[in-house]
């Protein structure tokens, strides 16, 4: 690879590192082409970009970004996954794959919102419900007091109408 190609790759990686909400590093030593293709397809479905890059290029590209703390992990074969939207989805796919392919694929570290997280933190992130489920729970929590208040307001006239109806039935019976 000539110098111009390397500079272009560094610039491209730098832009992706700056844009990504979360970046995950993994060691893919011993992975077969079939396994790599499966992982790429699963990550693509989760809107995650997956690349294999030279460690020296990653080192240069991560300078002056909030992902610079990953530098000590640029050793051995390094794959990098960029999540631009939902870091939880990326963590789920990568953690699941790391469990099923424990001999050939190991997570190294990640950066989420500018803070480095460990492999155990990645697993904890993967155990979270999806963004949609969390939003639904939040909306349910916000909506519950309003729904209860409406129920209380509707109960007062309802009980009054039932009381009047009971009086009417009682008078008709006499």
Curated annotation (Swiss-Prot):
Can you supply a Gene Ontology BP term from the record? Answer: translation
Among the GO molecular function terms of this UniProt record, one is: structural constituent of ribosome
Instruction: List the PROSITE patterns hit by this protein, alphabetically.
Output: RIBOSOMAL_L10
Q: Pfam families per the record?
A: Ribosomal_L10
Q: Which InterPro entries match?
A: Ribosomal_uL10, Ribosomal_uL10-like_sf, Ribosomal_uL10_bac, Ribosomal_uL10_bac_type, Ribosomal_uL10_CS_bac
Identify one Gene Ontology CC term for this UniProt entry. large ribosomal subunit
Role of this protein:
Forms part of the ribosomal stalk, playing a central role in the interaction of the ribosome with GTP-bound translation factors.
Per the similarity annotation, which family is this?
Belongs to the universal ribosomal protein uL10 family.
> What's the subunit arrangement here?
Part of the ribosomal stalk of the 50S ribosomal subunit. The N-terminus interacts with L11 and the large rRNA to form the base of the stalk. The C-terminus forms an elongated spine to which L12 dimers bind in a sequential fashion forming a multimeric L10(L12)X complex.
Which NCBIfam families does the UniProt entry name for this protein?
A: PRK00099.1-1
Q: This chain belongs to which protein, by name?
A: Large ribosomal subunit protein uL10
Organism (species): Geobacter metallireducens (strain ATCC 53774 / DSM 7210 / GS-15)
Its gene is rplJ
